[in-house]
A protein has these predicted regions:
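Rhodanese-like catalytic fold shared by cysteine-dependent sulfurtransferases
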Residues: 4-62, 66-67, 71, 78-235
C-alpha cells in the first residue's frame, strides 16, 4: 500500500513539474513573439542580377534561422547532371545549412531555354531535362504534369509561411521564386537569401567524406524531399 502511494505521489510530482515547464515555455513564447522580417530589398551589382536579398543573405542568415513562421528550402540537386566543373564548380551538394531542406528546382519545372543557352555559351551542358511536376512553356506558363503536382508544391512551399530560398549561385532560387509567384504565392513572402559559396557562419554542414584521394558524399545527412514520379498520376 505504501509503495503504491509513493508511486502515485512520484507520478503526480513529475506531472506537476512537466506542466510547470510547459506553462513557462508557453508564457515565454507568447511574451517573446518572433520579430518582423525586414522588407525585401534587392542587392546591388551582380547580386541584383541573381535577385539576392540585401537584408537577408549569406552574411546575415544565421540571425533568421529556426523561425516557426518560415520554411527553408535549398533548391539544388544532390547530384546535378550539368557539367558545372567546366566553371570550376561542383556537381554535388558538398554542404548545406542547418534548417534548410533540399527540394531541387529541377524536379519542379523545366529550365528556361535562355538559361540553357546561356550555360551552353559558358561550356556547361547536361542540365536536367527529365520528369518535372510542371511544364514551362515559352510564355512562362506553368502547366501541371500530374494530378498531384499542385498538392505537392503547396506542401513543400506552404502558403501560410515565409519562404527562404537558396542555391549555388542564385539562379535556381530565382527560378523557383518566379514559379511560386506565377502560380499562387505572395511575392513579398519569398526571399532569395544567398548563394552558398559565400556562407561563412556557424550552421554549415559538410557532406564531403574524403579518405586520402577518394571522395564520397554523406547525403544521408541531408534533409531531402524526394519526388517519386513513378507513383504520381499523369494528366
Amino acid at each position: 500500500m505504501k509503495k503504491t502511494l509513493s508511486l502515485i505521489l512520484w507520478i503526480v510530482m513529475w506531472l506537476i513539474i512537466w506542466l510547470g515547464i510547459l506553462y513557462l515555455w508557453y508564457f515565454y513564447w507568447k511574451s517573446h513573439p518572433e520579430s518582423n522580417l525586414p522588407a525585401q530589398e534587392l542587392s546591388e551589382g551582380l547580386r541584383w542580377v541573381y535577385w539576392i536579398d540585401k537584408n537577408i543573405n549569406e552574411r546575415t542568415i544565421d540571425n533568421y534561422l529556426h523561425r516557426s513562421d518560415t520554411v527553408y528550402r535549398d533548391v539544388r540537386m544532390l547530384e546535378d547532371s550539368a557539367s558545372w566543373e567546366n566553371k570550376w564548380w561542383t556537381r554535388n551538394l558538398e554542404w548545406f545549412v542547418e534548417w534548410f531542406e533540399v527540394v531541387p528546382y529541377a524536379f519542379l519545372t523545366q529550365f528556361p531555354q535562355e538559361y540553357i543557352d546561356q550555360k551552353a555559351s559558358e561550356n556547361v551542358f547536361g542540365l536536367y531535362q527529365w520528369n518535372t511536376l510542371f511544364n514551362l512553356d515559352q510564355s512562362w506558363n506553368y502547366i501541371s504534369n500530374y494530378v498531384e503536382s499542385m498538392e505537392i508544391l503547396e506542401y513543400l512551399f506552404p502558403k501560410d509561411k515565409y519562404i527562404f530560398l537558396m542555391c549555388g549561385a542564385g539562379w535556381y532560387a530565382n527560378f523557383t521564386k518566379k514559379m511560386l509567384v506565377a502560380l499562387w504565392r505572395d511575392e513579398t513572402k519569398i526571399y532569395n537569401v544567398w548563394w552558398y559559396r559565400n556562407y561563412e557562419w556557424n550552421h554549415g554542414i559538410s557532406t564531403v567524406n574524403k579518405i586520402w584521394d577518394v571522395v564520397s558524399y554523406d547525403f544521408w545527412k541531408v534533409p531531402y524531399h524526394e519526388i517519386d514520379f513513378d507513383s504520381l498520376t499523369e494528366k
